[in-house]
Regions:
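N-terminal intrinsically disordered/low-complexity leader segments
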Residues: 1-12, 181-182
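Short helix-capping/turn signature of helix-turn-helix
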Residues: 53, 102-109
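Helix-turn-helix
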Residues: 16, 20-58, 62
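Amphipathic alpha-helical linker/stalk segments
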Residues: 63-86
Length: 182
């Protein structure tokens, strides 16, 4: 029988659960996110997980949120706009399967749908900030949307990293002009 963990602080329990879920998502995708397996891994009852996360979708959101925070902690602060956008696109590529899972789960889960809307808004804000030096204020929104569409389109193709970067660089430079490489 799983042990009780009354001596462990709530925040520590939450952190353990989210970290275990994060590890499963990174290693095996959504299919590996099993509440029962996480409970066994942590030595707790399955209901203990549901005490903190009412549904598997709530746990998915918390784990993906952790992954995004890890990524954003490493984002470049300086550099040419095109290089920052390429960095952004490569991070999106690394988690393409999770992004597609989020999009799919959003169709049937309001908690995931709300999370997806927030993530898209955050990613768009990051792009706007990255492009602010090379796009005029009256074109920044369209530039961000065009670059986002370019990134998403290229990421859907099954091509090498070198080819992906070349296509993205080509598209970004055409969209934003020569100042984007400065």
């Amino acid at each position: 029988m799983p042990r009780t963990r009354a001596d462990v602080a709530r925040t520590d329990k939450l952190d353990e659960i989210v970290e275990a879920a994060r590890g499963r998502l990174v290693d095996g995708g959504y299919g590996a996110l099993s509440v029962a397996d996480i409970a066994r891994q942590l030595g707790v009852a399955q209901n203990a997980i549901y005490w903190y996360f009412p549904t598997k979708d709530h746990l998915l959101v918390a784990a993906v949120e952790r992954i995004l925070h890890d990524i954003l902690d490493c984002k470049p602060k300086r550099g040419a706009a095109v290089d920052r956008v390429l960095w952004f696109a490569e991070r999106l590529h690394e988690f393409q399967d999770l992004r597609l899972t989020i999009r799919e789960r959003a169709r049937s889960s309001e908690v995931v749908a709300a999370f997806e809307r927030n993530v898209v808004g955050l990613l768009r804000l990051l792009l706007v900030n990255s492009l602010s030096e090379v796009a005029t204020p009256d074109h920044i929104d369209d530039a961000a949307d065009a670059v986002m569409a370019l990134c998403e389109g290229v990421l859907l193709r099954d091509i090498s990293a070198v080819h992906r970067r070349r296509l993205l660089r080509f598209g970004i430079e055409r969209l934003l002009g020569p100042d984007s490489t400065v």
